[in-house]
């Protein structure tokens, strides 16, 4: 089955900003999250689709590749499980400019010897809870990594043999080609810039000199981190070529939708149901916060949809000196499954309200006045 367009999945335009994409993701993730839709396969599939679309469009490099090449430009099969390289397009352009200027993009060498390349960066996608994001979190991750082959000790050659000087470039890693009035230096097509070639490759690493293994890394997630932020682990990307420096590992953070709170920057929002008696008479209600429980007074006559602000009960962001606020949106509950006695009491209450006039229902009065003027 063909994949849907990622912008269509999130319901945003192709020129949508990062904030618009993030807000659309949060809204849909809350709607389709498995915790809110137990045993609902359709919602589960929608959630996976929304998550995949956000992972692609929230990454500027992947979004650019998707915009240009579509789904083929962000093939999830590239890279290892959990971690993905994103040096493919840079490598392609590096070859082009390296051929013209005699130096690969991000590398050095050319005249003095074989090309030296920095290793590609890797990306690891990690999902954490809102509580972990707010308070900080130390954990370990397992990522695929390349290490020196133990059989050939990193040479890439079959034991008992060794790499030989490339006969085409004589160990320089580059060759010169004349085209009319121009002399162009380009990467050697035989040794691909290494300056050597391997007549008998190692059977274990197939001549690469390295093998893939999984390594464990310590990751410290700072308190206040937000969805989509990345943590850089220097030197834990793919190894360099010909002595080049290794790339970096970027741990991209995704925060799971919360059952109670919705985050907006450093602020939190929650929906709070209250009895209609508390709304009418006033009282004190208890609300959850990330630090525990808090209470605040509800004035009498509170209407459904009223928002209360609890200062400092949000999240202290990475670049903030103070914590954000918690916004409690009150929803007045209508009682159900009433007994006959309760129904009689409510009827008496309704009658007393009618006798008291419109002063008991200010919103209804203003609404009826607007309707009346509409038909006049």
UniProtKB/Swiss-Prot annotation:
Ligand binding (Zn(2+) 1): 149, 152, 202, 205
Q: Which UniProt keywords apply?
A: Chaperone, Cytoplasm, DNA replication, Metal-binding, Repeat, Stress response, Zinc, Zinc-finger
ZnF (CR-type) intervals: 136-214
Question: Which residues does the UniProt record annotate as the domain J?
Answer: 5-70
Q: Which GO terms describe its cellular component?
A: cytoplasm
Ranges of the CXXCXGXG motif repeats in the UniProt entry: 149-156, 166-173, 188-195, 202-209
The subcellular localization recorded is: Cytoplasm
Listed transmembrane segments: none
The answer to keyword Hydrolase applying to this record is: no
- Cofactor binding remark: Binds 2 Zn(2+) ions per monomer.
- Residues noted as binding Zn(2+) 2 in the record, renumbered to the chain: 166, 169, 188, 191
Any one GO molecular-function label of the UniProt entry: ATP binding
Q: What is its main location?
A: cytoplasm
Gene Ontology terms: biological process: chaperone cofactor-dependent protein refolding; DNA replication; protein refolding; response to heat
Q: Do you know which Gene3D superfamilies this protein is assigned to? A: DnaJ domain, Heat shock protein DnaJ, cysteine-rich domain, Urease metallochaperone UreE, N-terminal domain
Which metal ions or organic cofactors does this protein require, according to UniProt? Answer: Zn(2+)
In the record, the note on similarity to other proteins reads: Belongs to the DnaJ family.
Q: What is known of its domains?
A: The J domain is necessary and sufficient to stimulate DnaK ATPase activity. Zinc center 1 plays an important role in the autonomous, DnaK-independent chaperone activity of DnaJ. Zinc center 2 is essential for interaction with DnaK and for DnaJ activity.
Query: Which HAMAP family does this chain map to?
Result: DnaJ
Describe the subunit structure.
Homodimer.
* Known role: Participates actively in the response to hyperosmotic and heat shock by preventing the aggregation of stress-denatured proteins and by disaggregating proteins, also in an autonomous, DnaK-independent fashion. Unfolded proteins bind initially to DnaJ; upon interaction with the DnaJ-bound protein, DnaK hydrolyzes its bound ATP, resulting in the formation of a stable complex. GrpE releases ADP from DnaK; ATP binding to DnaK triggers the release of the substrate protein, thus completing the reaction cycle.
- The protein in question is named Chaperone protein DnaJ
Query: What is the source species?
Result: Burkholderia multivorans (strain ATCC 17616 / 249)
Lineage, highest ranks first: Bacteria, Pseudomonadati, Pseudomonadota, Betaproteobacteria, Burkholderiales
Gene label: dnaJ
